[in-house]
UniProtKB/Swiss-Prot annotation:
Protein name according to UniProt: 1-deoxy-D-xylulose 5-phosphate reductoisomerase
Listed SUPFAM superfamilies: 1-deoxy-D-xylulose-5-phosphate reductoisomerase, C-terminal domain, Glyceraldehyde-3-phosphate dehydrogenase-like, C-terminal domain, NAD(P)-binding Rossmann-fold domains
Its biological purpose: Catalyzes the NADPH-dependent rearrangement and reduction of 1-deoxy-D-xylulose-5-phosphate (DXP) to 2-C-methyl-D-erythritol 4-phosphate (MEP).
Cofactor(s) listed in the protein's UniProt record: Mg(2+); Mn(2+)
Residues annotated to bind 1-deoxy-D-xylulose 5-phosphate: 133, 157-158, 182, 205, 218, 223-224, 227
Species this protein is from: Pseudarthrobacter chlorophenolicus (strain ATCC 700700 / DSM 12829 / CIP 107037 / JCM 12360 / KCTC 9906 / NCIMB 13794 / A6) (Arthrobacter chlorophenolicus)
Lineage: Bacteria, Bacillati, Actinomycetota, Actinomycetes, Micrococcales
Superkingdom of source: Bacteria
Disulphides: none
Binding-site residues, NADPH: 12-15, 38, 41, 132, 134, 211
Pathway: Isoprenoid biosynthesis; isopentenyl diphosphate biosynthesis via DXP pathway; isopentenyl diphosphate from 1-deoxy-D-xylulose 5-phosphate: step 1/6
Residues annotated for Mn(2+) binding in this entry: 156, 158, 227
Length: 394
């Protein structure tokens, strides 16, 4: 059997670097044919290109000539002089990489800029291993209409868990989905206690090692709100049948409750290499992708209700999803602006979700969901959030 040809979008980020680890551990199953990155770490991208032997490398920003020099230097150091991949540069580089000939496209880009690459990957016919939840959330019906059955395989640990659990019954037998949340670094704090939280504290996630935006979204639970919308779209389960529970140990990644009263859960130590491996190899499993639970050692798992008063983001996300249209895009864009302002020291931690709520309340939606209407709504949301943040700055 020939190895699956993999294109990795966002290769220098957390998902991308771990995906290369997965490929390294299973060279008989996978080979990397293309990489893309934003361009903020050209040296790492050059080393990745030489290491994987990718035929094409894309950068959204940065000097392609500098990248070519770095690749030559890395190739010489690795004893691979003469390796020269095609370099694709420009804002649409990831979209062009996504449209190349590959069996699987892993979209590990952060943010709604991943929408165009997601659509390009689906159009190409490749399986889409989706870590870029924002593209599905803001694209909604556009993304679903572009995908054939089974073409999108989730890489988020929660949705990967649900996909595995759903194999235990038919769609008609599913009662509800239960997404677990670690609770973030501020679990147990009241809304008042969250006012003085610093950016440094917000980035101290108790379980996962992620980028700035995703880590902050996990602290506000905006990320869990986005995951609820993603689960609703991926699995066609109504929002009122998707629950969120706090599970601080982050070993049970999500659960499916069936109509007979049984619950199937997926458990494993927190390690993103497992859902990444499943995304690349679905429906098969990759041996030794990650360490398993040690069932011979004593352990305690706890589950707690979500404090929706201190952390209103999940309910707010559900409301945006119920309204549909461009509301999820506005939710996401306003949040990204607010998170940037928070890390710039301009607003308080609790102002992030308050800003999202305020911008959503002013949005009227679009009569028809198109790529253009999504982009217009995002642009409006960012501008409106920016205006509100300028007024409410510390």
């Amino acid at each position: 059997m020939q190895p699956r040809r993999i294109a990795i979008l966002g290769s220098t980020g957390s998902i991308g670097t771990q995906a290369i680890d997965v490929v390294d551990g299973a060279p008989h199953l996978f080979e990397v044919v293309a990489l893309s990155a934003g361009g903020g770490n050209l040296a790492l991208l050059a080393r990745q290109a030489v290491h994987t032997g990718a035929a094409a490398v894309g950068i959204a920003a940065g000097d392609p000539r500098e990248l070519a020099v770095l690749i030559d230097e890395a190739a010489a150091a690795a004893g691979r002089s003469g390796y020269r991949p095609e370099i694709i540069a420009g804002p649409d580089a990831s979209t062009r990489i996504a449209g190349l000939d590959a069996d699987v496209v892993l979209n590990g880009i952060t943010g709604s800029i991943g929408l165009a690459p997601t659509l390009a990957a689906l159009k190409s016919g490749a399986t889409l291993a989706l870590a870029n939840k924002e593209s599905l959330i803001v694209g909604g019906s556009l993304v679903k209409a572009a995908a054939r059955d089974g073409q999108i395989v989730p890489v988020d640990s929660e949705h990967s868990a649900i996909a595995q659990c759903l194999r235990s019954g038919s769609a008609a037998e599913v009662d509800k989905l239960v997404l677990t949340a670690s609770g973030g670094p501020f679990r147990g704090r009241s809304g008042e206690e969250l006012h003085g939280v610093t950016p440094q504290e917000a980035l101290a996630h108790p379980t996962w090692d992620m980028g700035l935006m995703v880590t902050t979204n996990s602290a506000t639970l905006v990320n869990k709100g986005l995951e609820v919308i993603e689960a609703h779209l991926l699995f066609d389960i109504p929002l009122d049948r998707i629950d969120v529970v706090v599970h601080p140990q982050s070993v049970v990644h999500s659960m499916v409750q069936f109509v007979d009263g049984s619950t199937i859960a997926q458990a494993s130590p927190p390690d993103m290499r497992l859902p990444i491996a499943l995304g690349l190899g679905w429906p098969g499993r990759v041996p030794n992708a990650a360490a398993p639970c040690d069932w011979t050692k004593a352990a305690t798992w706890t589950f707690e209700p979500l404090d929706a008063t201190a952390f209103p983001a999940v309910d707010l996300a559900k409301d945006a999803a119920k309204q549909g249209s461009t509301f999820p895009a506005v939710f996401n864009a306003a949040n990204e602006e607010a998170v940037t302002a928070f890390h710039g020291g301009r607003i308080r931690f609790t102002d992030i979700v308050d800003t999202v709520d305020a911008v959503l309340s002013e949005h009227t939606g679009s009569s028809r969901l198109t790529v253009e209407s999504v982009l217009d709504a995002e642009s409006w949301a960012r501008a409106r959030a920016h205006e509100r943040l300028a007024v409410s700055s510390l």
